[in-house]
């Protein structure tokens, strides 16, 4: 069963570019080489003075998620330096089983 992993974080507007760059240079390389990684997307929106980012990744199965995230697969994986670009972030992710895709 394919797993969808959802995480959210928020930055000040002036740090939005740095937040995206942090994802592209720090987290994306780790995820993209992890066994069982299928793909990911990052999106953003303005939410009243902050920019919210949502990262959605897809994984082959729960074993792949655990290999990436460790023994607590619902715990967020936040590379060093994340605290420098985000105002706040979710410490936990939401995990879903993908039932169908187009």
Go through the PLM ranges and name each one.
Residues 15-39, 73-81:
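Short amphipathic alpha-helical segments
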Residues 21, 54, 69-71, 79, ...:
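Short amphipathic alpha-helical leader/targeting segments
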Residues 32, 66-69, 87:
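Alpha-helix boundary recognition
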């Amino acid at each position: 069963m394919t797993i969808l992993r959802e995480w959210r974080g928020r930055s000040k507007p002036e740090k939005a570019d740095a937040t995206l760059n942090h994802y592209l240079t720090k987290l994306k390389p780790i995820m993209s080489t992890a066994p069982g990684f299928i793909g990911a997307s990052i999106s953003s929106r303005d939410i009243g003075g902050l920019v919210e980012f949502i990262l959605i990744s897809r994984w082959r199965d729960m074993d792949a998620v655990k290999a990436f995230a460790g023994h607590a697969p619902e715990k967020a994986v936040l590379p060093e330096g994340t605290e420098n670009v985000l105002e706040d972030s979710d410490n936990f992710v939401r995990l879903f089983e993908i039932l169908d895709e187009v």
